[in-house]
């Protein structure tokens, strides 16, 4: 059984985001392209965004640190450390109100020939 410290990883990714022109950094902690389940820790500096994009499939967002705003066409949700939301299956965007770290969990269907 393998485990990691989300607290340590969050600090590491925030530091990396601070050195990045995009103001963000990410690390997949489970899964990837050959798995149906993927969990990614994403750090986003205050004022930076993940611009509007299509939903990748069934997904949830857990705020590990900071304060973020998730927007869809008709709705807005704000979350702080410890908050959790199921991401609607529609176009959405994420904005960091404060330096923030989230864990994004996505369930994707694999191609039938995989």
Regions of interest found by a model, annotated:
Residues 1-36, 71:
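A short, N-terminal "cap"/entry segment at the start of jelly-roll beta-barrel domains
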Residues 23-26, 38-55:
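Conserved short histidine dyad/triad with adjacent acidic residue
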Residues 48-50, 66-71, 92:
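Short beta-strand segments in beta-sandwich/barrel cores
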Residues 57-73:
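Glycine- and acidic-residue-biased ligand/ion/polar-headgroup-sensing regions
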Residues 64-65, 80-81, 98:
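A cytosolic small-molecule/anion-sensing beta-strand core signal
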Residues 73-89:
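Short acidic-glycine-tyrosine-enriched beta hairpin
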Residues 89-112:
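Ligand-binding loop in jelly-roll beta-barrel domains
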């Amino acid at each position: 059984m393998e485990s990691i410290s989300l607290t340590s990883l969050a600090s590491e990714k925030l530091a990396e985001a601070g050195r990045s022109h995009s103001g963000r950094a990410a690390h997949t902690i489970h899964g990837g392209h050959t798995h149906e389940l993927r969990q990614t820790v994403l750090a986003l500096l205050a004022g930076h965004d993940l611009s509007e994009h299509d939903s990748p499939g069934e997904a949830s967002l857990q705020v590990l640190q900071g304060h973020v705003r998730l927007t869809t066409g008709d709705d807005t949700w704000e979350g702080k450390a410890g908050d959790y939301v199921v991401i609607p299956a529609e176009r959405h965007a994420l904005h960091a109100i404060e330096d923030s770290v989230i864990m994004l969990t996505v369930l994707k269907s694999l191609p039938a020939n995989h």
